[in-house]
Structure formats: C-alpha cells, structure tokens
Swiss-Prot record:
Pfam families listed in its UniProt record: Oxidored_q2
Family: Belongs to the CPA3 antiporters (TC 2.A.63) subunit C family.
PANTHER family the record matches: ANTIPORTER SUBUNIT MNHC2-RELATED
Superkingdom of origin: Bacteria
Molecular-function annotations in GO: antiporter activity
Annotated InterPro entries: CPA3_antiporter_subunitC, NUOK/Mnh_C1-like
Subcellular location: Cell membrane
Coiled coil location: none
Primary location class: membrane
The protein's name: Putative antiporter subunit mnhC2
Entry membrane topology: Multi-pass membrane protein
Keyword presence, Nucleus: no
Keywords linked to the UniProt accession: Antiport, Cell membrane, Ion transport, Membrane, Transmembrane, Transmembrane helix, Transport
Amino acid sequence: MNLILLLVIGFLVFIGTYMILSINLIRIVIGISIYTHAGNLIIMSMGTYGSNKSEPLITGGNQLFVDPLLQAIVLTAIVIGFGMTAFLLVLVYRTYKVTKEDEIEGLRGEDDAK
C-alpha cells in the first residue's frame, strides 16, 4: 500500500509541476490545486502507516488506529486550498476581462517584451 500511495503522490506532483510550467493561466491554477492535493495525501500518509500505534486511552487489545489530528489538519488544508483556488480563478477571470489575455506571455508590458 505504501508503494501505491508513493506512486500516486509522485504522479500528482509530476502533473502539478507540468501544469504550473505551462503558459496558460487556468492550467497554472489547476496545477497549484493538484499540488495541494498531493500535499494532503502526504499528510494523510503520515498518520496512517506507522509502527504499532494503538489507542492512547484504552489499554485492552491492540487495535490499530489512525491519528485524528492529521485528519483535522487535512480537512483544514482542503478548505484553505478550495478558498485559494476560488480566489485564483477569480483573479485569472478578472485579468482576462481587463487584458483579454489568458497566457503569461501576453501579460508582459511593452518595456519587458523582447
């Protein structure tokens, strides 16, 4: 299971990097969103797999458990990531409405153009 999770996280980081390096603003926003999902999976994997974790208060039995603190952190990160994605989409939309450009190269000023 660790190998599958590692491959999924690596694939998400690869796709996120590829999308961030594109010149289209929407793809950049989607790439940042994919990065946040990869980060959430990394945090969740820290609490799932480990050595002999058991309940902190119950002494009978050796039931494995998942750390609830990491689940709360990931839930908070999902909400923050959603808000950040919504803000970036509105920013890209407003930039498109003002400049009629949806690519990075078109946003350069006359002084910066080569």
